[in-house]
Amino acid sequence: RESSAWVSQLGALRAANDKVPAAEARPAHEQWWKDFWTRSWIFPEGTEEAKAVGRAYALQRWIQAGAARGAYPIKFNGSLFTVDGFMDKKGVYEEFGPDWRRWGGCYWFQNTREPYWAMLYSGDYDQMEPLWKMYREAVPMLKERTKTYFKHDGIYCSETMHPWGLNKLGDFGNNNPDFYPTNGFVRRYWDSGNELSQMMLDFYEHTGNEEFAKNTMIPIADGVVTFYEQHYPKTEPGKPRFAPAMSLETYHTAEDPFPVIVGLRTVLTRLLALPDSLS
């Protein structure tokens, strides 16, 4: 039933688009791309290697622009540009279709972040909204998860996350009685919340968008720092001890990991420097 509803919605969207005559759609399409290419550019010159870098940069922006304006963020494993092909697996050729993606359908933040940092510094701010939207709409679920699992406030962002906020099931584990994923590579890997907050703070500094700051950036960043403040014990007043913790995916057991400390210090310093009008 859900798949038939999706097909019906897709058909309605196509029908709405078909109502726009090609004679009108084509000029609007061309104007969009003209505006896109003239709002920022880099054309390195001097050597063939420099020119090759420039072509790669332009291609990367084109790929991102073609995929970044949908309802969801760009998928790191193929984006819109998945293709038919073959995979050599232990000497066996295995067919797969254009909708097949290695690593599945979740968002892995370490990979998802890459095109969005590039958009930020290219000035392609409008293309970042699907990423903000996904996390903004996941906040109620993330708050409820923290309350249910750990009996305190705040939010933590999973490294492998469905659009609605929860872990990839294969990482969390079927019939897992614990509140931590069974996959050791992401069991306590929550650094993405700090980096996401940092990206949002940069976005606000670039754009000055106060509505974004009030409705997206501050609720998410506040939820992240609240989680760290309430989840970990204090060794003395005002001094938390981040353990047990992780350092990226690399070190599965860590105490006071460097990325967590630097992330929190940076984000908290920047949050405290925001104007009072945003509070």
Regions found by a protein language model. Give the residues of each.
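Acidic/polar, glycine-enriched structural segments that form the non-catalytic walls/loops
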Residues: R1-G105, Y125-E129, Y135-T146
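The feature captures the catalytic groove of carbohydrate-active enzymes
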Residues: S4, F76-G105, C157-N215, T226-S279
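Stable alpha-helical elements in mature extracytoplasmic
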Residues: W6-Q9, H29, E49, A56, ...
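Short, functional "switch" segments adjacent to catalytic/cofactor/reactive centers
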Residues: W37-T38, A50, G54-A56, K147-D178
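Extended, well-ordered alpha-helical scaffold segments
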Residues: A52, A56-L59, Q127-A138, D153, ...
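A general structural signal for short secondary-structure junctions and capping/turn motifs
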Residues: G54-A56, G105-F109, A118, Y232-P233
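Alpha-helical support elements that line or immediately flank enzyme active sites
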Residues: I63-G66, T112-D126, W190, N194-E210
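Glycine-rich (often Gly-Gly/Gly-Pro-rich) flexible segments and glycine-rich loop motifs
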Residues: Y107-Y149, V260-P275
